[in-house]
Amino acid sequence: MVAPAPAKERIQALKELINNYDYAYYVVNNPLVPDSEYDRLIRELQALEENYPELITLDSPTQRVGAKPVKSLGEIKHEIPMLSLNNAFHEGELADFHRRVKTRLGIERVDYAAEPKLDGLAVSLLYQDGVLVQGATRGDGITGEDITHNIRTIPTVSLRLRGEKIPSLLEVRGEVYMPRQGFEQFNREQIAKGEKPFVNPRNAAAGSLRQLDPRITANRPLALFCYGVGQVEGGILPDRHSEILFQLKQWGLRILPYSEVVEELAGCEKYYQHLLDLRDKLPYEIDGVVFKVDYLDQQQILGSLARAPRWALAYKFPAQEELTQILDIEVQVGRTGALTPVARLQPVFVGGVTVSKATLHNEGEIQRKDIRIGDTVYVRRAGDVIPEIVKVIMERRLPDSRPFQMPRQCPVCGSEIVKEEGGAVARCSGGLYCPAQRKEAIKHFAGRRAMDINGLGDKLVEQLTKQGLLKDVADLYGLTKEQLAGLERMGQKSATNLINAIQQSKHTTLPRFLYALGIREVGEATAQVLAKEFGSLEALASVSEERLQQVTDIGPIVAAHIAAFFRQPHNRQIIQGLQKAGVCWPEVEDKVQIVQPLLGRTFVLTGTLESMTREQAKERLQALGGKVNGSVSPHTDYLIIGANPGSKLVKARNLGITILDETYFRNFLDDTSFP
């Protein structure tokens, strides 16, 4: 069947419209339409292409994840080599580079194009007549791997260039990376699935691009920034690197923010310091800055060596990996009794701070890396991430070193250490008797999403437990103003405010109270389910594990934790103490009478809502039977977005999940007629 002219025209119009919206959203950071309208256009285009498959083209926005898995990654030869950059690590090396440039050019002043040095994976994108036809890794600079099927899945990669005077053949070079937020969320999901997390965003990006199945890559939070060009045919580009970047942006490609032209050595030094100050505030990792002689004719005069051009330099930031020695391995006890080994290090300056400790996660991780006291190790720190041991330098291992063993008794209370079959985490069996667990349990109990006791911060809890004023959470309701006023940094006014907050917290809800108790594996959503299912604390406390397993989303492990908690006499005593102190909640309605129009639907929230907090939105959805998760997955039904949404929005679009802005969300809450 020949497609009618109106269908052809509408498909072309939709592709142009969607590509324009993508440009506004990803390149100039200025969304033009609500996501609901964007999704409607995508669905319309998909429907038309299903009816007229002969009209599907490579540049269609619907074809990002259209390729089939490949058996292996082919090789692609770079017509113009993708060279490395020479590195500088201190001001003297930067000054030497600047002096060599001026001497070779025989000029008094040099303009440099200055750019952040993104810590990702270098790639080449080939456009023919404005359409993306090929993607390749840098490889060894001469030959890379064919990743066309994967590069197309990245939302920030333009499938078709826009604008005028686009060369018939244009090779664009850039860096694929994984934003910090996306990386952290992705690793949390990996751990939750029992899979190995990535060490850093760069490794995550590289591993994602080398997948054989593009559907896997499409589910990874990847993005791209462009930093230059390679092969160009059938067109003319500007004669300055900075202007080429501007032209790439006009054609619909993303370039790095903070790219600018600086003058002379002083301009380079000022730019370096500015980016160093910004480093940990950026949503992506950078490991330095790059300076390129801006004028192309000057670049040609300077030429290149076999490995790197003479006209560019990477000025690296202070190392975020350094060598140091493990002085000792200490074991910390958390709120749930989990034992976490921590390496005490010879202090070392890493990534702008002095590091003296690093997490070792668990006994299995120590054994996998064969970490021992006295070892010389590489320690890494990136942004605000807790420092960690990367690897051991075996050549420097002491001859009398011994493998580390977890203690058999809790280092805090002396209780027996237990480890579940097949589990990685060792735990103290002391429960709330253990001072370490007690302290963390009180902090959790007072948290904003639990009993919401405003003013009871971590340091105050430390003081109260240290002085013996708090032995368990029930003791909170027996505190007096006189006791509080005598503490460090606590006057009469602060004491009065805290007492008032404690009194206000007595009136709560059953789901909040259950969550506040800190039962293992019982988060906010599970607490909601339990409250609705059993209706009262007494009913829940008396049920068997078998009955608990009949509840939606409650498996055997969670059921065992709940039953074990209520079997513990000490926990029952604490609950009785809380109720005796006046902690109460309204009766939960009979579950049969509760209207839950959103039952079975899963929601994720992102961004800042204007009409309510995300916590309030979550509670309203849960009250209507909806399930609210923290991350987007193929099981998500709706993503609700506020201002400044994060990487969840990109992932939701890739997965075809329905996206609702705040206006739609409020309307749907009123009549609960979700699409």
Swiss-Prot record:
Pfam families: BRCT, DNA_ligase_aden, DNA_ligase_OB, DNA_ligase_ZBD, HHH_2, HHH_5, Nlig-Ia. SMART domains: BRCT, HhH1, LIGANc. SUPFAM superfamilies: BRCT domain, DNA ligase/mRNA capping enzyme, catalytic domain, Nucleic acid-binding proteins, RuvA domain 2-like. The keyword Hydrolase does not apply. Its EC number is 6.5.1.2. It catalyses: NAD(+) + (deoxyribonucleotide)n-3'-hydroxyl + 5'-phospho-(deoxyribonucleotide)m = (deoxyribonucleotide)n+m + AMP + beta-nicotinamide D-nucleotide. Keywords: DNA damage, DNA repair, DNA replication, Ligase, Magnesium, Manganese, Metal-binding, NAD, Zinc. Zn(2+) binds at C410, C413, C428, C434. It comes from the Bacteria. GO terms for molecular function: DNA binding; DNA ligase (NAD+) activity; metal ion binding. Residues 593-675 form the BRCT domain. NCBIfam families: dnlj, PRK07956.1. Belongs to the NAD-dependent DNA ligase family. LigA subfamily. This is DNA ligase. It comes from Nitrosococcus oceani (strain ATCC 19707 / BCRC 17464 / JCM 30415 / NCIMB 11848 / C-107). The lineage of its organism: Bacteria, Pseudomonadati, Pseudomonadota, Gammaproteobacteria, Chromatiales.
